[in-house]
Amino acid sequence: MNAPQKHSAPITVEVALGDRAYEIVIGRDVIASLGERIAKLRPGARTAIVTDRTVAKTWLKRTEEVLDQVGIAHASVIVGEGESSKSYAGLEQVCEALIAAKIERNDLVIALGGGVIGDLAGFSASLLRRGVDFVQVPTSLLAQVDSSVGGKTGINSPQGKNLIGTFHQPVLVLADTAILDTLSPRQFRAGYAEVAKYGALGDEAFFAWLEANHAELFSGGAAREHAVATSCRAKAAIVARDERETGDRALLNLGHTFGHALEAATGFSDRLFHGEGVAIGMVLAAEFSAERGMMPAADAQRLAKHLADVGLPTRLQDIAGFTQEGLADADRLMALMSQDKKVKRGELTFILMEGIGRAVIANKVEPAPVRDFLQRKLAQA
């Protein structure tokens, strides 16, 4: 893979969806162009900024300023932090606030936050007046490389993650890499799991580049922009050919079947961030693949080593409070995975691996080998 170049101008990636195509704009301080871009996209539109309390303290004023500079009217909706806001109560709060702000069909909702805010604001926009357009301004690494791109929106159910939702594409994504400087190390690492996922599922050269350059990526600079842009290009290409996840878009769920079950088992709490669940889930998927003879054991070890090298959890016992609340229970994890969105006619579908950069969709996976695998992993704790 070529070394990243220093960019004096933002990088633009197109999500090619015909008349619903949109741009992902990546670079430092691209948020400064938000007002001008909205004015061109929707002349005369009013806006509502949906964000959480933490992001509001740092970025709401700046966002309001760039809208004020071009005379765009704006309201603000502030919700609590974390997965607990991706709920029926959170959805009601946002929808009622948007209605009270008189946001109409020709107006715009701005999702200013991480993956939770993007999912919640996008879902609310998709329902409001049967569909209002929205803009993603992702403020976490995970959101910039994954959840802000592709149009998946939704909330969680007590029975599982993202079980209630819609496909609703944004009209613009602004990925300001300067915002990532404000993330905690743990938040940044969690987002990095999704970056590594793109290499693991379909681009061995990118994975090797990450192994060699992750320190520079974590410190900022051109490597960070390069990683975000490469990740967005990979996702945009898959979304363009399979928007509704009827085919190979499911590959983007590498690590998510195990990971979502672990998130649900921990109550969608900060005991396990989404990216951390994905990291453990990818390692479990790789190890399960190796046990089935699909993937060299050395590749599974290589994946686990890289994720551990950057400080991500890679084992079930790395989860805080591992033995609490029934987490160390294979039957409970199997029950949670049975609610996975990829399940078809009650049969499990997993994203497994044939090697680094070669993920495959495995349909009709028998539950008994999965349960046995989990029981053995749990016994190692």
UniProtKB/Swiss-Prot annotation:
Function: Catalyzes the conversion of 3-deoxy-D-arabino-heptulosonate 7-phosphate (DAHP) to dehydroquinate (DHQ).
GO biological process: one example: amino acid biosynthetic process
GO CC term (a single one): cytoplasm
Enzyme Commission identifier(s): 4.2.3.4
Required co-factors: Co(2+); Zn(2+); NAD(+)
Protein name: 3-dehydroquinate synthase
Binding site for Zn(2+): 194, 256, 274
UniProt entry keywords in alphabetical sequence: Amino-acid biosynthesis, Aromatic amino acid biosynthesis, Cobalt, Cytoplasm, Lyase, Metal-binding, NAD, Nucleotide-binding, Zinc
Main subcellular location: cytoplasm
The keyword Zinc is annotated on this UniProt entry: yes
Cofactor: binding details: Binds 1 divalent metal cation per subunit. Can use either Co(2+) or Zn(2+).
InterPro entries in alphabetical order: Dehydroquinate_synthase, DHQ_synth_AroB, DHQ_synth_fam, DHQS/DOIS_N, DHQS_C
Binding-site list for NAD(+): 81-86, 115-119, 139-140, 152, 161
Gene Ontology MF: a single term: 3-dehydroquinate synthase activity
